[in-house]
């Protein structure tokens, strides 16, 4: 399996102009300039409370700042990663060792082992997973042992409390950790994808590139009182997603799922899914979803966006056009300049 060191990964240029999230209005916006913003979203923004000239000017400044942040993101992330690698002293250095079987739940290992066995099929795999929704193709399986969840949380909290620089985990969450910057991509997330998730996803989602996953973006998000409490409805920049609840003690914060983002009335009927510490939810990246408000405690989740360049090189899932490639750090957003392998995938238009 190729790694970021062996291949050059890219992002789509739309990252700096599309899907800019404004939490207080609950909107993802496309932004190029003030004229375009007024033309495309003026009426909608007014209906969401952006009424006065001061409101609009504040929004305009926020969007310009976010575009600037995104343009600098790759370079600044590389600088943070280098500084962390040279100066940070882990509390639990064992989590930086190569992924050990002892860190994984027996159910997860058994499901992955079955998936690589001769004659393995979807029916047999589903006997080893919990089907949360057959219609929405959402599944759950224990991923990490309780001990490993605790150890990883201790390390994440130690890093959070350190004076090391920290990047936002994604464009919607404000609190969390990028696994790439912390140095946990190579020892933890990459083997998790290559050894275990790839065979599982190949059987569960062959029509979404499950057998061709060659990169990822992994981050931990933190929800707590006085910080991020909930998460607005969105879809992921991924073919497939793993979302693992790490802890701690909390109430509320359930995930909710609608339909695929391309489908009409995608949020007409939603499904709520409670978190189970140590277990992961598997779903399609294009499935609309969000998180209900946290009621008390702290919730930490590891989210892995799983990407297949053979799929996304054809069509960027964020702008729904052929990607305009820009070189990026690490795995970028999972695009490559190579001619993609022919893969039969399900795409709604």
From Swiss-Prot:
Gene3D superfamilies: q2cbj1_9rhob like domain (2.60.120.620). GO terms for molecular function: dioxygenase activity; iron ion binding; L-ascorbic acid binding; oxidoreductase activity, acting on paired donors, with incorporation or reduction of molecular oxygen. This is 2-oxoglutarate and iron-dependent oxygenase domain-containing protein 2. Its EC number is 1.14.11.-. It comes from Mus musculus. It holds the Pfam family OGFOD2-like. It comes from the Eukaryota. Belongs to the OGFOD2 family. 2-oxoglutarate binds at residue 299. The keyword Iron applies. The keyword Chloroplast does not apply. Its cofactor is Fe(2+); L-ascorbate.
């Amino acid at each position: 399996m190729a790694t970021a060191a062996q291949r050059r990964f890219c992002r789509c240029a739309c990252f700096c102009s599309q899907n800019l999230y404004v939490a207080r209005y609950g909107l993802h916006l496309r932004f190029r300039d003030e004229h375009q913003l007024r033309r495309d979203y003026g009426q909608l923004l007014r209906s969401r409370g952006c009424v006065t000239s001061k409101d609009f000017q504040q929004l305009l400044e926020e969007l310009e700042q976010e575009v600037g942040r995104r343009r600098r993101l790759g370079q600044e992330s590389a600088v943070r990663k280098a500084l962390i690698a040279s100066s940070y002293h882990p509390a639990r250095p064992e989590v930086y060792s190569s992924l050990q079987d002892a860190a994984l739940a027996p159910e997860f290992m058994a499901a992955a082992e079955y998936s690589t066995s001769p004659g393995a099929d979807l029916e047999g795999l589903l006997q080893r997973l919990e089907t949360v929704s057959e219609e929405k193709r959402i599944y759950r399986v224990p991923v990490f042992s309780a001990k490993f969840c605790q150890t990883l949380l201790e390390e994440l909290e130690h890093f959070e409390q350190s004076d090391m620089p920290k990047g936002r985990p994604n464009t919607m969450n404000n609190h969390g950790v990028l696994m790439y910057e912390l140095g946990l991509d190579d020892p933890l997330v990459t083997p998790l994808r290559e050894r275990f998730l790839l065979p599982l996803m190949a059987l569960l989602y062959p029509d979404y590139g499950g057998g061709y996953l060659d990169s990822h973006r992994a981050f931990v998000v933190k929800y707590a009182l006085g910080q991020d409490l909930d998460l607005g409805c969105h879809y992921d920049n991924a073919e497939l997603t793993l979302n693992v609840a790490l802890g701690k003690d909390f109430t509320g914060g359930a995930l909710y799922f609608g339909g695929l983002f391309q489908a009409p009335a995608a949020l007409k009927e939603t499904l709520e899914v409670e978190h189970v510490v140590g277990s992961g939810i598997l779903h399609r990246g294009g499935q609309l979803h969000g998180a209900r408000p946290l009621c008390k405690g702290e919730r930490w989740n590891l989210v892995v966006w799983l990407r297949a360049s053979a799929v996304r090189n054809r069509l960027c899932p964020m702008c729904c056009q052929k990607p305009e490639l820009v070189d990026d750090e690490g795995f970028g957003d999972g695009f490559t300049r190579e001619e993609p392998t022919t893969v039969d995938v399900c795409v709604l238009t």
